[in-house]
Amino acid sequence: REIMAAPSKGCEENIVEFKILDLVNNVQSFGFLLGYQKKVYKEQDPANIKAAESMGKLHDRLKEIGYDGHPLEVYLVRLLFCLFAEDTTIFNKQQFQDYIEFRTNEDGSDLAPKLQELFQVLDTQREKRFKNLDEQLAEFPYVNGKLFQEILPMASFDTKMRQTLLDCCYIDWSKISPAIFGSMFQSVMNPKERRNLGAHYTSETNILKLIKPLFLDELWAEFENIKNNKNKLPEFHKKISLLKFLDPACGCGNFLVITYRELRLLEIAVLRALNKSGQGFLDVSEIIWLDVDMMGGIEYEEFPARIAEVAMWLIDHQMNMLISNEFGQYFARLPLKKSAKIVH
């Protein structure tokens, strides 16, 4: 006997057929019943399948040469942060790409020590850096956040691996959605590992279906009732800034990321209501009260836990850029001082 699984009628290309005996190997095909969405990366998405494949190639090659386990996981998360950073004003535009292109050999022989040096610089305050530091390195900001703190074993690169990393740099990461960040990044792992880890991607639509009636709709309704009351607006602002959220099985942080983003959008609406005169604020940093440490999660595996933590920094930065555009002041939280509390 055979079973057919199809997410919706009229979608013949999505139909999966298999024998009942093979059900255990195809149970993921029924993920749509629980709101899980198949990992599909559209070509128009900046973080598209090309990015996932490039990171996957780098992951596979590093693993082949023996760079594996915890060091590899941390290494990849760091690289992806750098790729995101140079396209979103955390770094200067193409700063990471230029460093690789102009400060490392084409054969990749010195890429590993050069990256090691960069990671150390990103974890060192400017005033504590060596006075004779390479000028291109010296321009990188102090990131902190413990992301670059751990000293990892030295990796090893060749010509193809260096080019693969550069191919990742050539992709535009500026529009990356941290909501699919974890799903995309875990796609560098092989399918068998993904199935064992239960690395599902819950669609943004389904996450919103859950959190809106749970608390978001109520908060927006409360805001609508007091948005013209200058006395109650600060009280409401304080209320949402004191909220705490926990996802006890957070995976790569999809729920946490989208929840935080929606709360930051609500905060922007509050600030907009407080600034009806259009005069702006003297210091935007003083009136941004929501931060990533209001979000917490529990995850058994270290890799998705680290991804979730970084994804929270990324969505926070995106929302800070939105604030910057809204009120005409550049606002970025660097060095990183707070983080989502992800326990693994």
Where are these regions (language model features)?
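Metal-dependent nuclease catalytic cores in nucleic-acid-processing enzymes
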Residues: 1, 311, 315
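Nucleic-acid nuclease catalytic cores
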Residues: 1-9, 76
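Preference for the N-terminal adenyl/adenosyl cofactor-binding alpha/beta module
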Residues: 18-262, 294, 298-307, 311, ...
